[in-house]
A protein has these predicted regions:
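ATP-binding/phosphotransfer module of carbohydrate and carboxylate kinases, centering on a glycine-rich
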Residues: 1-64, 69-72, 77-113, 117-145, ...
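Flexible loop residues that form catalytic
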Residues: 155, 218, 342
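Short glycine-aspartate micro-motif
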Residues: 87-91, 147-151, 213-217, 223-225
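Short, ordered coil/turn segments that flank beta-strands lining enzyme active or ligand-binding pockets
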Residues: 83, 104-105, 161, 228-229, ...
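Conserved residues at the C-terminal ends of beta-strands
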Residues: 153, 249, 340
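Glycine/GP-enriched mid-protein hinge/lid loop-to-helix segment characteristic of carbohydrate kinases
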Residues: 111, 121-125, 184-305, 346
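Glycine-rich phosphate-binding loop and adjoining helix at the ATP-binding site
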Residues: 109-212
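Hydrophobic beta-strand positions
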Residues: 101, 157-158, 226
């Protein structure tokens, strides 16, 4: 099986590009006849027949037999061969990793979540990331050479086309994707985490079929993914979606981006954590008091757990964050938007303040 045309961004031959488009069509639409592919791609039947035949020879496409019809010649149905290749996905959070492997049709084979990991802008943290990915791959009943690529979600400013991350792991001149490829020996793609989530929601989520959406991701930080006319909007150098860094408050709180008063300073997981510490020091009570007193690490999962256990201080602050977020969203002129707040099951704590009349 040859994978050169599939993985190379330099293969600009007409045949290579059309083969990629055919594979993308089957990934998005499932099994289909040659006539259906021709109609969608505006290509002739001889051209598509030849390309699909070559993809069959390479092992990417299978012939699933004749389609049942009411009359006339029965066309063959073709679809992706699920075992022809695999893709690994890596989601990097502030204090954990989520890893998954999908077959060539996009079906999940295995998912491992909440793997302990500390995200830091250091070579040691990058090496630890590679160790975790290697351990996951080595545990799979799949030959390493059948993994076609690894997609890695990273927070902050990411240029997916050049392979650079400008917010984390930016201590070398080379693109981060190249550094990771040298360490893992597998093709690497990096992308902003919120943009990836937005695209996944567009393909399979509650807004499937809509062409224009905003995806708002509230985790330790705050960002948005933008879909315009069915396409991901990247902006200049891939820096679109920095919603959390609009100048919004007169609070003199220094954001990690270097500015003061960013929306993220009052509407994010880091804002929840900072405000919780401030209120506790002022005399408020919380079930996280013992951890605070002991100087233990408190991550987003600890804050979420406190909310689920109905810690009143955490809930009160979460409601304030919801109200702040609503004020920010009110300025976004869009018909459909999706809000993701990591693992919060009782949405009423923050959704109701977010949707107050004076906001939305």
């Amino acid at each position: 099986m040859t994978t050169k045309f599939l993985l190379s961004s330099d293969d600009n031959t007409r045949s290579g590009l059309l083969k990629k488009k055919i594979i993308h069509y089957y990934m998005a639409n499932g099994d289909a006849t040659i006539a259906e592919v021709c109609k969608e791609m505006n290509l002739s039947i001889p051209t598509v027949t030849k390309l699909i035949s070559e993809l069959q020879e390479d092992g990417y496409i299978l012939d699933f037999g004749k389609q049942e019809t009411s009359g006339g010649r029965k066309p063959s149905i073709y679809g992706l061969n699920p075992v022809s290749g695999y893709f690994v996905g890596v989601d990097i959070l502030k204090d954990q990793l989520n890893l998954a492997i999908l077959d060539f049709k996009g079906d999940k084979i295995r998912i491992e979540q909440n793997i302990p990991y500390t995200l830091e802008n250091t070579p040691a943290a990058l090496d630890h990331l590679c160790e975790c990915i290697n351990e996951f791959i080595n545990s799979l009943p799949i030959p390493r050479e059948k993994i076609l690529s690894i997609g890695i979600n990273i927070s902050g400013r990411v240029n997916p086309f050049a392979g650079y991350s400008y917010s984390i792991f930016y201590f070398e001149e080379k693109p981060l994707s190249q550094i990771l490829e040298e360490k893992l020996h597998i093709k690497i793609y990096i992308e902003n985490d919120t943009r990836s989530m937005a695209y996944g929601e567009y393909l399979q989520g509650v807004v499937k079929g809509e062409k224009n959406i905003l995806f708002i991701n509230i985790s330790w930080g705050l960002g948005i993914g933008i879909i315009i006319d069915g396409k991901v909007y990247f902006g200049k150098s891939g820096f679109s979606g920095e919603f959390g860094h609009f100048s919004f408050f007169e609070n003199e709180i220094l954001c990690h981006c270097g500015k003061k008063g960013c929306l993220e300073t009052g509407a994010s997981g880091s804002a929840l954590y900072r405000t919780l510490l401030e209120r506790y020091k002022e005399g408020s009570n919380t079930i996280l008091a013992s951890k605070i007193d002991a100087g233990e690490y408190i991550g987003l999962s600890d804050l979420i757990d406190a909310i689920q256990k109905e810690d009143m201080l955490s809930i009160e602050i979460l409601e304030e964050i919801g109200f702040n977020l609503g004020k920010g969203i009110a300025g976004l002129m869009v018909r459909h938007f999706v809000i993701s707040l990591t693992n919060i099951r009782n949405w009423s704590y923050w959704a109701a303040p977010c949707r107050r009349r004076e906001n939305i």
